[in-house]
Regions:
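Bacterial N-terminal signal peptides
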Residues: 13-21
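Bacterial N-terminal signal peptides that target proteins for export
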Residues: 2-13
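Accessible peptide chain termini
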Residues: 1-2, 342
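Extracellular attachment fibers and their assembly/anchoring modules
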Residues: 1, 24-25
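Carbohydrate-active catalytic/glycan-binding domains of CAZyme proteins
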Residues: 25-342
Length: 342
């Protein structure tokens, strides 16, 4: 074989190899995407505690991964929940979604021992901060709030401070819930002040320092009717909204309050949703995306491989959210259609 033929053969082989690599990547991308065909939104895993983030024209959705284990339905004392990791999904149009897999686990914190409970991810100055609930080991032995950081919305995330941000001894001013320090939510107000809210049994509120990884001042409490857990902060126009899981008739509903500033006063506005189907808990996540507002939440209607939904096997859903002229939010009916294209 002369040198010209050898070069041609090498180029053909390289082209064929490149095509194989491209085909493999394309197939993988297709395997990691799915179409929104109604609620529940995610149908191949049990998911809970949705937390949306909009960044650069893409909506990222962070959820806890509920995983079934033998004997789960007879467990008690919080052991009904087996939430092993946080997953991330993304979309540019609310219809086609990409599954980015696991982006953080409780054991990614050296002091964490398990339980990937409710969280929120925010972006600030090119960094992504993951405020989250973790079961901590010694010397804490309780639910705490940690913070991880990444250069990308899909991770990897690493512990930002090497210890919990908020622990039990810091919140003794609240009426004791099952777990004081769970379900963090973040907002940056119009003055550039960062705030964090969280709680179970009591709704806590605190300022953050400009580095977003230290509290700034005292931890306050917000008196909200029937507050249970799962606060979510957002702003629309001149109003701030504090939406949360409230106690309904035996199960949780979503209620909310509004205020002219993060310092209050907070005015209760009643229920935003009824109880979630087949689920004791419900958890709000509210965001504006592509000119529309959305409420993410979870129920427990998904059946997966013959395993039915339950208190610890939930399924994330989404509905469009509408406002009245006075800024109050219209009651949201939970549907099977959700926001799927018709």
């Amino acid at each position: 074989m002369n040198s010209d033929m050898l070069q041609i053969t090498k180029k053909l082989a390289l082209s064929a190899f490149s095509l194989l690599i491209f085909a493999g990547c394309t197939q993988k991308d297709e395997q990691n995407t799915f179409q929104n065909d109604g609620n529940p939104l995610i149908k191949n895993k049990f998911t809970a505690d949705p937390a949306p983030l909009v960044h650069d024209g893409t909506l990222y959705l962070y959820v806890g991964h509920d995983e079934y284990y033998e004997g789960q339905d007879t467990a008690s004392g919080g052991k009904e929940f087996n939430i092993t990791e946080w997953l991330c999904y993304s979309t540019e149009d609310m219809q086609k979604w990409t599954d980015h897999g696991s982006v953080l686990k409780p054991t990614d914190f050296e002091w964490g021992v398990g339980e990937a409970w409710a969280s929120q991810v925010i972006e600030h100055e090119g960094k992504f901060y993951y405020y989250t609930t973790v079961q901590a080991g010694e010397p804490y032995n309780s639910k705490v709030i940690g913070v991880a950081v990444s250069d990308s919305p899909t991770g990897p995330f690493t512990d930002a401070i090497g210890k919990p941000l908020i622990t039990d001894e810091m919140t003794s001013n609240g009426a004791r819930g099952w777990w004081n320090d769970i379900d963090p939510t973040f907002i940056m107000d119009e003055e550039g002040q960062a705030w964090l809210s969280w709680g179970n049994g009591t709704c806590f509120l605190a300022r953050l320092k400009p580095n977003l990884i230290e509290l700034d001042g005292e931890i306050e409490t917000v008196d909200l009717p029937l507050f249970v857990e799962g606060p979510w902060l957002h702003q629309r126009g001149d109003l701030y909204y504090l939406t949360y899981a409230s106690m309904g008739e035996g199960r949780e509903t979503i209620s909310y309050a509004t205020a002219p500033s993060m310092e209050g006063p907070w005015t209760p506005q009643g229920e935003l949703t009824g109880m979630a189907e087949n689920s004791f808990t419900i958890h709000p996540g509210i965001v504006e995306f592509n000119g529309s507002w959305y409420l993410f939440y979870h129920n427990a209607t998904l059946t997966l491989d013959g395993i039915e939904g339950a208190i610890g096997r939930r399924s994330v859903c989404v509905e469009e959210l509408h406002y009245n002229p006075d800024g109050t939010m219209q009651f949201v009916e939970q549907t099977t259609e959700g926001v799927a294209s018709r």
